[in-house]
């Protein structure tokens, strides 16, 4: 969107939402709206139903783990006190507007936000995916269960503290004639590239 359209949309959001919005920022030609988790259900309805907004389509929803998000590893970005966020990407077909909405879960140990399925039914599988991969609970979701990992999977693989090798591995046991689980046998290791610091290395002597 052009700068003038972004500025108008930001002004409309501030006017319509008032104190219910925490922050509106613009980067790379997109607006990001930050709201409290307690206000999410009401704000979602306003974003969809208000004639000046009309965000009738939820394009995508994802979870984010900010536990290792700091100025030490991500220059120019502020670390958040709250660990988990849910990010929604919305589209207004009528006005041809796009909006990113970010909501932080208040509890780092048991992250929970309200489901937006009553407003955007397409959130169904998106919320199940965020639940499966990040362990974020979506209140009032009618069928909140894993969608990508196996039924007996332990943990949430997109959390920063989840081991890269996982906890268990599965294989086919010819004796039992079925797939079995066993503790992972891969040993974690750090691979450091070998750097040769000789300035003339590899040059043939003339």
UniProtKB/Swiss-Prot annotation:
UniProt KW keywords: Cell inner membrane, Cell membrane, Membrane, NAD, Quinone, Translocase, Transport, Ubiquinone
Q: What is its EC number?
A: 7.1.1.-
What reaction does this enzyme carry out catalytically?
a quinone + NADH + 5 H(+)(in) = a quinol + NAD(+) + 4 H(+)(out)
Q: What would be one Gene Ontology cellular-component term for the protein?
A: plasma membrane
* Highest taxon, organism lineage: Bacteria
**Where would you find this protein in the cell?**
Cell inner membrane
The annotated subunit structure for this chain is: NDH-1 is composed of 14 different subunits. Subunits NuoB, C, D, E, F, and G constitute the peripheral sector of the complex.
- Of which family is this protein a member? Belongs to the complex I 30 kDa subunit family.
Which NCBIfam families does this chain map to?
NuoC_fam, PRK06074.1-1
Q: What does this protein do?
A: NDH-1 shuttles electrons from NADH, via FMN and iron-sulfur (Fe-S) centers, to quinones in the respiratory chain. The immediate electron acceptor for the enzyme in this species is believed to be ubiquinone. Couples the redox reaction to proton translocation (for every two electrons transferred, four hydrogen ions are translocated across the cytoplasmic membrane), and thus conserves the redox energy in a proton gradient.
Q: HAMAP family in the record, alphabetically?
A: NDH1_NuoC
**Name this polypeptide is given:** NADH-quinone oxidoreductase subunit C
Q: Which organism is it from?
A: Nitrosomonas europaea (strain ATCC 19718 / CIP 103999 / KCTC 2705 / NBRC 14298)
* Organism phylogeny: Bacteria, Pseudomonadati, Pseudomonadota, Betaproteobacteria, Nitrosomonadales
């Amino acid at each position: 969107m052009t700068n003038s359209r972004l500025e108008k949309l930001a002004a409309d959001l501030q006017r319509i939402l008032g104190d219910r919005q925490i922050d509106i920022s613009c980067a790379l030609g997109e607006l990001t709206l930050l709201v409290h988790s307690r206000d999410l259900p009401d704000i979602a309805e306003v974003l969809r139903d208000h004639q000046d907004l009309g965000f009738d389509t939820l394009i995508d929803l994802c979870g984010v783990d900010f536990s290792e998000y700091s100025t030490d590893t991500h220059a120019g970005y502020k670390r958040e006190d709250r660990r988990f966020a849910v990010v929604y990407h919305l589209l207004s077909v009528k006005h041809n507007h796009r909006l990113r909405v970010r909501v932080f879960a208040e509890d780092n140990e048991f992250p929970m936000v309200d489901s937006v399925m009553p407003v955007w039914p397409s959130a169904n599988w998106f919320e199940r995916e965020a639940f499966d991969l990040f362990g974020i609970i979506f209140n009032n979701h009618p069928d909140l269960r894993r969608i990508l990992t196996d039924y007996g999977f332990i943990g949430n693989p997109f959390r920063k503290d989840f081991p890269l090798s996982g906890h268990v591995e599965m294989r086919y046991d010819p004796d039992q004639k079925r797939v079995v689980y066993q503790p992972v046998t891969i040993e974690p290791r750090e691979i450091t590239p070998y750097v040769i610091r000789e300035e003339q290395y590899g040059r043939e002597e003339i």
